[in-house]
């Protein structure tokens, strides 16, 4: 399916669900914003303590992190991963015409450990790619873009299998994924003049569109057929 066809499908799936989808986005924004400020408070307090302990009024260090700073970042990463997984599950259901409830946001707690492991491993690999050059980093980011969907659809799939299957599924599809993302730039630029209010409509639209991209990849045959098809094409 083309980008325009995926977008049309996303709009159709969101009919009658826009208000609830906006609430989901709002909840995620509020939680991550508040948590971000709390984690920032950890950083400020720990920096102030460092300053008092060293006898100086202000101490700013970018070379090392205090235990409180590390704790703040870890908490934010865990909660953000948890909410992202739930949000992806919510919009994946919408993209398939299934009954999606707000409770979906916190319904994937059992998958959190595996989601954290997948996020850490893929994050390290992508970071190494960006250290080399920007383009390799982008390619690796796209290569691992299917991991959340795969985990939600296949909770018993191993961590390394999720990473491997995502890479395999995206062979020959990276450019289409990249172009789909680029096609939303115009809308994203409108976030500033609308003071971010457009995000409550735009983010569900984008998320459901990318869910449709994933659904189109796996088709009716499921993940196994999609992986097998991409493997054969790559040979």
Regions found by a protein language model. Name each.
Residues 1-235:
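Hydrophobic alpha-helical membrane segments
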